[in-house]
């Protein structure tokens, strides 16, 4: 049952992650002129590694499910750390949290394969800016992305009390990666839709 849930959750997370990536280049009728005219290469870069990342995440989930299944009285449970102080794993309200976590693990994998993660497993400013601006020759877009990535990294560092000299645990990596991705997507969307001002 848990294995079936894990596979279902992985599929939902992949769809959610793919849909969110489409928002990274919202060129359309509502976009101001001379903004976001060129699509960044981030979608192509994700497409190149997403299948491999999906397989890695599925393998990890199956391994985790087997460990849970064979554990006596649930005393050994890696995922419990992630849900500490929260609701029981089987509670129905956890489903969206699980999907979010799996999508975050996918993004962490994508970031890792695009050199946007440091040696301790944390997303980096230079790596993320390079990933999200590759293929775009627009100063305003670059500056908006730089500001957005900086703000998002600072926000997640504060939220998760990140100490960058410490190695990130797997559950932390996934949650941080999702929040960083979600935040950067919002910032880029704000810029492309004209809700964020250019630097002149």
Swiss-Prot record:
It is found in: Secreted. Its main location: secreted. One of its GO terms (biological process) is sensory perception of smell. Residues 1-29 form the signal peptide. GO terms for molecular function: odorant binding. Keywords: Disulfide bond, Olfaction, Secreted, Sensory transduction, Signal, Transport. The keyword Secreted applies. It comes from the Eukaryota. InterPro entries: Odorant-binding_protein (IPR052295), PBP/GOBP (IPR006170), PBP_GOBP_sf (IPR036728). Disulfide bonds join 105-174, 152-183. GO terms for cellular component: extracellular region. Belongs to the PBP/GOBP family. PANTHER family: ODORANT-BINDING PROTEIN 59A-RELATED (PTHR21066), ODORANT-BINDING PROTEIN 73A, ISOFORM B (PTHR21066:SF18). Present in the aqueous fluid surrounding olfactory sensory dendrites and are thought to aid in the capture and transport of hydrophobic odorants into and through this fluid. This is General odorant-binding protein 70. It comes from Anopheles gambiae (African malaria mosquito). The lineage of its organism: Eukaryota, Metazoa, Ecdysozoa, Arthropoda, Hexapoda.
